[in-house]
Design a protein with these regions (language model features):
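Cross-family detector of peptidyl-prolyl cis-trans isomerase
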Residues: 1-138
Length: 138
């Protein structure tokens, strides 16, 4: 289930212009229990579908700590991958997004890295905060 939302006091805010690294505020309170998506900018290009290969910039924050874990913007290199090869939260939360768009994804643990976590700043049962800029649908 995907909850699309436009605003919630518990969700982090995202700021910054298109084409640059977003700034994400620290989350407040308990995370949503379902996948939540919010379009920060709606793109006008080609639409991503479940079978798409994508070129994106992304920023990842851990909900429990509010710590920025990683960002492709820091290296200046986009990430390219088939949507079918990433975590379920992306597989469910990215389709429908269009090139040029920026989307906030709040991904519960069962659609992320689950009870095992991913090591480092992504511990067990971590809710993930992603801001995804869809550069290209390949």
């Amino acid at each position: 289930m995907v909850n699309s939302t436009t605003e919630s006091s518990a969700l982090p805010s995202v700021s910054g212009p298109k084409g640059s690294k977003p700034t994400i505020s620290a989350p407040v309170g308990n995370p949503p229990v379902a996948l939540t998506t919010t379009d920060i900018y709606v793109g006008s290009g080609k639409e991503a579908v479940e079978t798409s290969t994508l070129e994106v910039h992304y920023t990842l924050m851990a909900w429990s700590t509010g710590v920025l874990v990683e960002s492709s913007w820091d290296s200046g290199q986009t990430a390219t991958f088939p949507l079918s090869g990433v975590i379920a939260g992306w597989q469910q939360g990215i389709p429908g997004m269009k090139e040029g768009g920026r989307r906030l994804l709040i991904i519960p643990p069962d659609l992320g890295y689950g009870a095992q976590g991913a090591g480092g700043a992504i511990g067990p049962n971590e809710t993930l905060i992603f801001v995804v800029d869809l550069i290209s649908v390949l």
